[in-house]
Amino acid sequence: MEIDILSLFPDYFDSPLRSSILGRAIKNGLLKIQSRDIREFGLGKWKQVDDAPFNNDGMLLMAEPVVQAIRYVKRRESRVIHLSPQGVPLTAQKSRELAKCSHLIFLCGHYEGIDERALEIEVDEEISIGDYVLTNGGIAALVVIDALSRFIPGVLGNQESAEKDSLENGLLEGPQYTRPRVFEGREVPQVLLQGDHQAIARWRKQVSLDRTRERRPDLYVRYLYDRESEDVPQMEADPKQSAFEGECAVVLDVENINRSKRFYSKVFKSNQPIGDKLYIPGKTQMVLHLQEVGLKNKNTAVLSLRLDCENDFYSFLGRWKMLGGTLEQADDRGAVRLVRDFDGHLWAISCKKAK
């Protein structure tokens, strides 16, 4: 694979690309990476590459130097990527996809960004490594290069390690242990010492599910939706769930029951609550049992709701935000949206037809 990095600071990449696994991959000819200075394509005697944006502060990279830099290295098979917090999230799946390309061009932004016209003309896609802003796009480019390189045959000493690493199956990896068996009173789990490979595999899967559910509920919900036909190990019954004469009831701890009643009544277009119970309309009768516990004793839950059509999906999200709930995160297909209510409960709202 060949990679060209376009940046105002090409020397920034020298040390990372000479070190460790990436350095070895370049030395062995598995990767060919060049960093180029956008200033080489600057305008006029002083090689100008930036200017003040209209109706805003700071400095912006100009369209012409950026476009000329891209066209200088671009080939028919090239894929041009702009590193930006506005892009699609970088995932293991996206890294696999990029690893199949023969030539990648990474465009690194600086200052307040890049003139939008350059992006519209020459960029194929934008990729984000997270919901935050960096001092320069070079850091993000290195992250993407490192992530995709793991899927290029020969880069890792053992390619199986790339397949087994955390997130490769949609879940966080479980804990790892080495000698000694006991350290400061903490023992290695007994199942790992017995040599029963099937039992170890079951244990690893369960621990991986538990860890993902607790630490990354967004990944856990996506995993469940992506594997609807797959048997997912059943968790122990949640004491917060109970049955009310054939109805499905979910008990939610809330700080202020009147506030929560108003919120859920309006967001679900439900009838007036009966006591502390709120009936959610739909094909399957569900009851929210609101339990006022105050702020200190409140436990938060993760819930899932699937809507039938796209209009209902977006209308529901609109009501949620308008009534004071927060919209947290969407998956890269837009089919699952994570939202939080006033009490911190996380809901995964989904619709198969949403785009």
From Swiss-Prot:
The protein here is known as tRNA (guanine-N(1)-)-methyltransferase
Q: Which GO terms describe its molecular function?
A: tRNA (guanine(37)-N1)-methyltransferase activity
CDD domains found in the cross-reference section: TrmD-like
Binding of S-adenosyl-L-methionine occurs at 109, 129-134
Q: Which Pfam families does the annotation name?
A: tRNA_m1G_MT
Q: Belongs to which family?
A: Belongs to the RNA methyltransferase TrmD family.
Enzyme Commission number(s) from the entry: 2.1.1.228
Report the gene name: trmD
Q: What is the lineage of its organism?
A: Bacteria, Pseudomonadati, Chlamydiota, Chlamydiia, Chlamydiales
Which GO terms are recorded in the biological process aspect for this UniProt protein?
tRNA N1-guanine methylation
UniProt keywords (A-Z) are: Cytoplasm, Methyltransferase, S-adenosyl-L-methionine, Transferase, tRNA processing
Q: Which domain of life is it from?
A: Bacteria
Where is the protein situated, by its record's location annotation? Cytoplasm
Query: Which organism is the protein's source?
Result: Chlamydia felis (strain Fe/C-56)
Instruction: Give the main localization category.
Output: cytoplasm
Q: Which reaction does it catalyse?
A: guanosine(37) in tRNA + S-adenosyl-L-methionine = N(1)-methylguanosine(37) in tRNA + S-adenosyl-L-homocysteine + H(+)
Q: Which GO terms describe its cellular component?
A: cytosol
Its function?
Specifically methylates guanosine-37 in various tRNAs.
InterPro entries for this protein: Alpha/beta_knot_MTases, Glyas_Bleomycin-R_OHBP_Dase, tRNA_m1G_MeTrfase_C_sf, tRNA_m1G_MeTrfase_TrmD, tRNA_m1G_MTases_N, tRNA_MeTrfase_TRMD/TRM10
Keyword Cell division included in the entry's annotation: no
Subunit structure of this chain's protein: Homodimer.
Q: Can you tell me which residues the record assigns to a coiled coil?
A: none
